[in-house]
Amino acid sequence: MLIDVKNLFKIYHEGEESEVRALDGVSLSVDRGEFVAIIGQSGSGKSTLMNILGCLDIPTYGDYHLDGVDVTELSDRQLAHIRNKQIGFIFQGFNLIPALNAWENVELPLIYQGVPASKRWERVEAALERVGLAGRADHKPTEMSGGQQQRVAIARAIATQPPIIMADEPTGALDSRTGKHVLEILHGLHEEGSTIILITHDNGIAATAQRVIRIADGHILYDGDREGAFA
């Protein structure tokens, strides 16, 4: 089991007496090599859940083990190490650094990892080729379309060779044709052995996953195969 979450809560306080339970007793597990879609409307708790699964945030209480490690007990430095080694992130807003070109954006997490220059070259080149952008390596984000920027973000996510890819609404800012291409890349990565966790509000996109988790008001309403998710 790669991810194991039990009785997870994330509570925000508004004033002295009011509280919002973004996550309210969530439990789930993800095996290595699964393709899981977490679906829900805005405010459902799906992005909060991804932030905790991705070690970008910590729960108010509850248990979370990632590859056997209790991440709720880790320091900020240790969480950053896990993010850099274990997880590749893809966001709806791309989150590329405007001053850097495509090559430099993809290379940056490898520099943080301390990967030698020769290895960095190999990995960046392979990642950009994987997403079909080797010919745009010297282009900055403002010189690329939204779809190209998202493919650079995918290249950045896979360059570190993480076992887990977490994608938060990766097609949300794209047209349908470009979004389909991005999904094809994610499915290709899954076929090569990556564990994919996809956050979406779109039933059609969620239906391409092996497994669907439907969340609303901080609760899991459905967790099972895609055939039963939309019955």
Regions found by a protein language model. Give the residues of each.
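Conserved beta-strand-loop-alpha-helix hinge in the C-terminal portion
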Residues: 219-231
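ABC family nucleotide-binding domain
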Residues: 1-215, 220
